[in-house]
């Protein structure tokens, strides 16, 4: 009896190794493109973006989910690095701070040219693959970071931004965030405001992917209806398996299918199992569910490494992707489906976004209205209403001064 148990255990181990070997073989030619990694945020918190410090060496950095050896072990060939600053920068120094975070991503590429290749288009991702480098792209996480400015949007595009997450954990003057659905924030735009819709049109024209992670369901539906190009969820999971408001409900997944869009599954335990603990097979369940509802072309990976504190057992850092792929092969995912998940689906969406951009010419020029803006530190140059108010206030002050002068003479 013991011999039989040993024999079957040995067969199981061999089968497991076989699936992992198959995963590695696939990933050697189609490496992972992950949709969301917060290493730049960790570089700010740990080193104040001083990359030349000896303890900031990405070949040796031990306290993060991400470093160069782990990326190589995980067969990561493309990464959207998150340029992120929290919502408390809104109406303050958001634009300055996001420029600094984009700068640190560019400096990563300059400091480690043998590992990272900063790219800005879909064809260059494939070129980076061929050179054995990590194609490094910039995703700006939070619409508050453009300060409701079409000009800032365009400038960040020219500096390398290739997706914009419309909100983080706060509303912008033009889009509602996911906390509205939980009842923690009030709906202000009830999805997208008229300016928000114009801003999405400008994103389409530029070739900036629209990222709907962190937004309210109403914002999701507005964007999926309005966008001329497919959209992405850079780091979200399936609401049906874990009813957290950061996840994507099935009716939205159907819209994702109808628009050839993409959901890149988040590994944060609270979004996977709705608890502090989760497992690798539970992440595979989310991938299975999205594939079932939206199709194999609609699923990708957006682990949220270095942006979360709790990760599933078996997916503790970026080196673990082959184990997840082995689990999917064990579940009878085809090689074509696996390659789609790893990279091909994202490259398709990115290419379609670029194609839409090539067919759009005229930029959006009408700015957000003055009454939609907030913040006591603002100036209002260019707004005729503000100019009118300024003239009226100036005339009132002059009249009062004249009256006081006459009273003084009396």
UniProtKB/Swiss-Prot annotation:
Give the principal location in a single coarse category: membrane
Where on the tree of life does the source sit, at the highest rank?
Eukaryota
Check the record and name the CDD domains matching this protein: rDP_like
Q: Name one GO biological process term.
A: leukotriene metabolic process
Q: Which residues are noted in the entry as Zn(2+) 1-binding? A: 36, 38, 141
Q: Which PROSITE patterns match?
A: RENAL_DIPEPTIDASE_1, RENAL_DIPEPTIDASE_2
Required cofactors, per record?
Zn(2+)
Leader sequence range is 1-16
Tell me which UniProt keywords the record has, alphabetically.
Answer: Cell membrane, Cell projection, Dipeptidase, Disulfide bond, Glycoprotein, GPI-anchor, Hydrolase, Lipid metabolism, Lipoprotein, Membrane, Metal-binding, Metalloprotease, Protease, Signal, Zinc
Task: Return the protein name.
Answer: Dipeptidase 1
Organism for this UniProt entry:
Mus musculus (Mouse)
